[in-house]
Amino acid sequence: MHRAKQPANIEKIHSSFSAQAKDFESERMNFSKQEYLDYTIRAIQARKTDALLDAAAGTGACGRSLSPLVASVVCLDATDAMLQQGRAMAEAAGLSNIRFVQGYVEQIPYPDAAFDIVITRLAFHHFPEMERPFMELHRVLKPGGKLVIIDMEAAEEDLRDREDRIETMRDPSHVKNRSRGEFAALYERYGYSVKKMEHTDIAVSLDAWMDLTQTPEKIRRQIAGLMEAELSGGERTGFSPRREGGTLWFNQRWLLMLGVKGADKAGAPCKNPG
């Protein structure tokens, strides 16, 4: 079996997420808050016979939450420190049907049509391009299976570059937030019947957000300064910051998209009619 080709920004991903692993599910962050995980579980409607892939899983918060509801779970991630953290949590919870596997979404180490459900959460904004990861997620999903993507939605068009610039200041592994239309186009091109495309606002503390990535003090001040400037009537950042009790907060716009795969060939998009 040939060695998986590494994504172009893999060193930045390893560096960022090795640092984040220990605090990735911190109560100060909302990324793994139980109400959001429960919302995802309700949306997926998994069956006890399902084989599930949690791709770019991080610590496997989604996979671990879904583990009691399905036959088996694979949590795939590029960063070993994240997998170690997730594996320890799964063992502590007594989850016996879950595996943690190191690998890349761009080259998933499983055969075609291996899973009934494929989910990836907060990953696409780290991918240099969308097509290859989507094609691989599509390839390993069975016909009739569910492909669930949860990610941050891009700001309005004239603010996208500015928002991504600030995101990259905070986390150099960030590439760009994608729009609802960009995701919808992929689902359509690969022949999915889209069942859900829903928006949720996630409240985020600016300090906790920067603490997670261990953002250097100089950059923290720059980012906070940009947020403060917007609050004072200056240039918009795309974050729509607000002050609560002396602390800066903003909302992340999360999209949840769920599509059911059609019966076309595993690795190929559907041909456009006509």
Predicted segment positions?
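A short glycine-rich, Lys/Arg-flanked "PGG" loop and its adjoining helix->strand segment in the class I
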Residues: 131-143
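A short acidic, Gly/Pro-enriched loop at the edge of an enzyme's catalytic core
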Residues: 106-117
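A short SAM/SAH-binding and catalytic strip from SAM-dependent methyltransferases
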Residues: 116-129
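Short alpha-helix
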Residues: 176-191
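Conserved Class I S-adenosyl-L-methionine
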Residues: 195-274
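Conserved class I S-adenosyl-L-methionine
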Residues: 1-47, 61-65, 82-85, 93, 148-174, ...
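Class I SAM-dependent methyltransferase SAM/SAH-binding core
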Residues: 53-107
